[in-house]
Amino acid sequence: MVPAARAVLDMAAFAHNFAWIRAAAPDSKIMAVIKANAYGHGLIRAARALPAADAFAVARVEEGIVLRQAGIAQRIAVLQGYGDEEGMRLSARHGLEPVIHSGFQLDLLERLDTSVPMGVWLKADSGMHRLGLADEEFARARLRLARMPQVRQPVPVMTHLANADATDDPTTEIQLRCFGRMAGGRGEFSIGNSAGLMAWAAARSAWVRPGILLYGVSPFPGRSGPEEGLMPVMTLQSRLIAVKQLKTGDAVGYGGDFICRRPTRMGIAAIGYGDGYPRRAATGTPVLVRGRRVPLIGRVSMDMISVDLTDCPSAEIGDTVTLWGQGLPVEEIALHADTIPYVLLCNVTQRVNMVETVA
């Protein structure tokens, strides 16, 4: 039986996008960000598809442990660090590198008893005001870490850019200057996320931390991955399970929100918000059928969507329907659904069959 909803993952696209990043930041090591199940693409799958990555970054200790148990040997930074003593000890046991962003974590770390010094990162709050230590707190933390024999030295430092995708906004320049003052001119630093490494030369430091770029998606509003020279890894697809003829004036779907303004040939595709397709996708959101764009009509249901096939008369039951990916950028669908592509990729649910290909 052919699964109704599937995400076709182009494994060659991972290598292409990684090479693109390497060319964009040739003097930087690459810490590939594969948190949140690799933005919906599969944590272990992504790690194995990126053997040239100098390190990986995950959000949580549990994610790092999964990678170690799968045999992933590269350095693994844990961006949220640890939240208790058990998390700290598990990080040490599995060779993870937690990011230190609070005095609470430092207090725990001072009590760590280990024969092998643990690698950690120190997080500077340069202006995003989420995680990290600023000004005097940062300086004190750096000194405390330098005095800890249980910590591998020297301790690298990172920060996160809040607005790097807005190239005409002064926030990033302010953050870069702030980080420069706190971190000083020497040391192992990581600044640039996807937008940062693309748009800000000063963010291409010893380490860059690309996330969304790895998956072939642009971090910039109004631009798509293919326009940047990237290849989408995920193509979300389903198939037509019904085709029917409607009359002018017929209402479609829950609430009858869409009223046919002409005799309409309607198709039903077996995918909905239960698969991760956005419920807020508006009438007119494009899908691909037989290589042609046709519009979504009516509300998105849990398991199905309705599309107008009037201008695609050759479409028939069983045809593939592409929701985003190859030929239809996920960035465009995100605009129609009033969201961001990160959300769409991360929200693909477990009942969607993941199919690996090499295009």
Curated annotation (Swiss-Prot):
Statement: the UniProt record of this protein carries the keyword Isomerase: yes
Residues the record lists as N6-(pyridoxal phosphate)lysine modifications: 35
EC number in record: 5.1.1.1
An example Gene Ontology molecular-function term: alanine racemase activity
Binding annotation for substrate: 130, 302
Cofactor: pyridoxal 5'-phosphate
Role played: Catalyzes the interconversion of L-alanine and D-alanine. May also act on other amino acids.
Descriptive protein name: Alanine racemase
Species this chain originates from: Methylococcus capsulatus (strain ATCC 33009 / NCIMB 11132 / Bath)
Gene name linked to the record: alr
